[in-house]
From Swiss-Prot:
InterPro entries per the UniProt record, alphabetical: UreF, UreF_sf
Tree of life domain: Bacteria
PANTHER family: UREASE ACCESSORY PROTEIN F
Key words, A-Z: Chaperone, Cytoplasm, Nickel insertion
Protein's UniProt name: Urease accessory protein UreF
Family from the record: Belongs to the UreF family.
S-S pairs: none
Cellular localisation: Cytoplasm
UniProt subunit comment: UreD, UreF and UreG form a complex that acts as a GTP-hydrolysis-dependent molecular chaperone, activating the urease apoprotein by helping to assemble the nickel containing metallocenter of UreC. The UreE protein probably delivers the nickel.
Role noted for this protein: Required for maturation of urease via the functional incorporation of the urease nickel metallocenter.
GO molecular function terms noted in the UniProt entry: nickel cation binding
Any single GO CC term annotated in Swiss-Prot or TrEMBL for this entry: cytoplasm
Signal peptide residues on this chain, from the entry's feature table: none
Length: 240
């Protein structure tokens, strides 16, 4: 019997292992950015009857991913990452300002800016790196969540494709968690929704990698309206 390790048992190079460890940490539900308190308008969609079960939640999130905030945030993350990598302070500021402005409601702006601020704060205290302070300063006062993730990942040399797909997975999982608490859904149905959205997450990430800032835009009027209507919703659990 051979004592040689199989190819599948070969360890990852140290740099890849560190990048994977950091990415999984930053995008874990345990990373304290407060994502659990936001629903991106899903709470109003449930109240209005647009989302009432696993199938309608899947369809709603598929649209948000491919034609709404999911795609826009993915594109912004990519451009923030590349500007950080190039030390393009002017370009990074332009992306950060666009990301802060490109939201459909006051609550959605609160959602992305508060998470971005928390992400940067924790990253600088626990995961600081050479160049991170400069990149953060270049972003100005308002740093949206996807910009924050792009800046930190680029500063640590975590590959962009992995960062992007990890970010989309984390955002989608949080949306599903919100939907599960509101509808409500069981754990198995929630995982079925996530599994069904895998192709959409991959397709959105792949498209965002080659998209320009001119490609930004949404076609999810109902979801955008939901984020506006949530601001005056009488009874609610979430901040957006």
């Amino acid at each position: 019997m051979s004592t040689e390790p199989e190819a599948s048992a070969q360890p990852l190079p140290a740099q890849q292992s560190a990048a994977l460890f950091r990415l999984m940490t930053w995008l874990s539900p345990a990373f304290p950015v407060g994502a659990f308190s936001y629903s991106s308008g899903i709470e109003w969609a449930v109240e209005a009857g647009d989302v009432e079960g696993a199938a309608s939640l899947r369809d709603w999130l598929d649209a948000m991913l491919q034609h709404g905030a999911g795609f826009c945030d993915a594109v912004l993350l990519c451009h923030a990452y590349r500007a950080t990598e190039r030390h393009d302070d002017a370009g990074l500021l332009a992306v950060a300002e666009l990301a802060a402005a490109l939201v459909t409601s006051a609550e959605r702006q609160l959602e992305t800016l508060s998470q971005g601020r928390a992400f940067i704060e924790i990253a600088r205290k626990a995961w600081n790196s050479d160049g991170l302070g400069r990149a953060v300063a270049a972003c100005g006062e308002a740093i949206a969540y996807p910009v924050a993730v792009g800046v930190v990942s680029a500063s640590h040399g975590v590959p962009l494709p992995a960062t992007l797909h990890g970010f989309l997975h984390a955002v989608t999982s949080n949306w599903i968690s919100a939907g599960a608490r509101l509808i409500p859904l069981g754990q198995t149905d929630s995982q079925r929704v996530l599994a069904a959205l895998e192709p959409s997450v991959i397709a959105t990430g792949t498209r965002a990698l080659t998209a320009s800032l001119d490609d930004l835009g949404t076609a999810t009027f109902r979801a955008d309206l939901a984020s506006l209507r949530h601001e005056t919703q009488y009874t609610r659990l979430f901040r957006s």
